[in-house]
């Protein structure tokens, strides 16, 4: 009987690692462990975010279906604006979206300006946290809703706290509520392929004494653990025309990603009244990629001069849709953003190359 050739120590280590990785994937699913340089990501259906840069940073072309996503940041950082764009993208693809407005603060006119079909949007304004999460659970279980947004975790107040006296303390009530709800929701979300987005706020920790970040999110630790994607959104610059403020430069950092390598960032402009400026992104990303030639403050696309200054070019491209679409198509091709599968809620994703992006 021929002897099995002996393996070198390096080959034995590599074989042991491959065995461990395959065991982890069998137990916890594809994507539980990956290299930061991996290009082959988990093939799952997604809902685009409305931002080219953010879709690229997420690694799969948008917010994953059948998963929990958390979007958090300081006040007025663009959290609700981003989720309204995601709702609009879902509706464009024939999907059904629900917005659970626990804060009772949704601006319907603003949502409409961002492209949301408010007549088809399911809206709930629950009285307490248990009601909000129960409604979310029933919508997910129906397998007929593609996207559920809960705005926000901080407003999910337990019923016992609302019915108690003003001075009563309910220590950990919200954290227990979130932990119980997410244990119940997670399996159903995966089966129905519904994308569930929780909007969250930031609070300051007490007594950190300079060690670690002083910031934390509300609702305990359960949402951190159950989320497949966590996005930190921040306003980093105010956009002004002389003295008039017309928007903000916004950065989104992917602080957790179980479907692609994390820690990537996206930058885009949020313009007051109109939301994320896709045209602005085309200019920025196109210039970085060399598709748009930038010489000083002048911009050109091939032999065609676009204008001087980003705002002038933005105005030109907003008016000239064919030119904007030509630049965008070339940019998407350059970035290698492959077509994504949307897939209706409850539908198994097909293994084809259908272009729903």
Swiss-Prot record:
One of its GO terms (cellular component) is cytosol. Transmembrane segments: none annotated. CDD domains: RecA (cd00983). It is found in: Cytoplasm. ATP binds at residues 73-80. It holds the Pfam family RecA_C. InterPro entries: AAA+_ATPase, DNA_recomb/repair_RecA, DNA_recomb/repair_RecA_CS, P-loop_NTPase, RecA-like_C, RecA-like_N, RecA_ATP-bd, RecA_C_sf. PROSITE patterns: RECA_1 (PS00321), RECA_2 (PS50162), RECA_3 (PS50163). Gene3D superfamilies: P-loop containing nucleotide triphosphate hydrolases. The keyword DNA repair applies. One of its GO terms (molecular function) is single-stranded DNA binding. Belongs to the RecA family. This is Protein RecA. It comes from Nitratidesulfovibrio vulgaris (strain ATCC 29579 / DSM 644 / CCUG 34227 / NCIMB 8303 / VKM B-1760 / Hildenborough) (Desulfovibrio vulgaris).
């Amino acid at each position: 009987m021929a002897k099995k050739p002996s393996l070198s120590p390096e080959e034995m280590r590599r074989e042991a690692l491959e065995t461990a990785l395959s065991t982890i994937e069998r137990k916890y699913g594809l994507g539980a462990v990956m290299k930061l340089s991996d290009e082959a990501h988990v093939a799952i259906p997604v809902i685009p975010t409305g931002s080219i840069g953010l879709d690229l940073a997420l690694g799969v072309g948008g917010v994953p279906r059948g998963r929990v996503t958390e979007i958090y940041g300081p006040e007025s950082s663009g959290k609700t604006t981003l989720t309204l764009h995601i709702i609009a993208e879902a509706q464009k693809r024939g999907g059904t979206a629900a917005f659970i407005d626990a804060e009772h603060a949704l601006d319907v006119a603003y949502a409409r300006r961002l492209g949301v079909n408010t007549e088809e949007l399911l809206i709930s304004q629950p009285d307490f946290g248990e009601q909000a999460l129960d409604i979310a659970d029933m919508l997910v279980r129906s397998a007929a809703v593609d996207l559920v947004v809960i705005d926000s975790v901080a407003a999910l107040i337990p019923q016992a706290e609302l019915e108690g006296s003003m001075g009563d303390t309910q220590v950990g009530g919200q954290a227990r509520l979130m932990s119980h709800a997410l244990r119940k929701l997670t399996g159903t979300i995966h089966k129905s392929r519904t994308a569930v987005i929780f909007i969250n706020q930031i609070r300051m920790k007490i007594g950190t004494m300079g060690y670690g970040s002083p910031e934390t999110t509300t609702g305990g630790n359960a949402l951190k653990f159950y989320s497949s994607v966590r996005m930190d959104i921040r306003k980093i610059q105010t956009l002004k025309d002389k003295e008039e403020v017309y928007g903000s430069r916004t950065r989104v950092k992917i602080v957790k990603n179980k479907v692609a390598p994390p820690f990537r960032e996206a930058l885009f402009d949020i313009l007051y009244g109109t939301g994320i400026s896709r045209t602005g992104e085309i200019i920025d990303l196109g210039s970085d990629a060399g598709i748009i030639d930038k010489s000083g403050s002048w911009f050109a696309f091939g032999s065609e001069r676009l204008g001087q200054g980003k705002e002038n070019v933005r105005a030109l491209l907003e008016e000239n849709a064919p030119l904007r679409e030509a630049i965008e198509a070339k940019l998407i091709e350059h970035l290698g953003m492959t077509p994504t599968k949307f897939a209706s809620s409850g539908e198994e994703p097909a293994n084809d190359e259908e272009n729903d992006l």
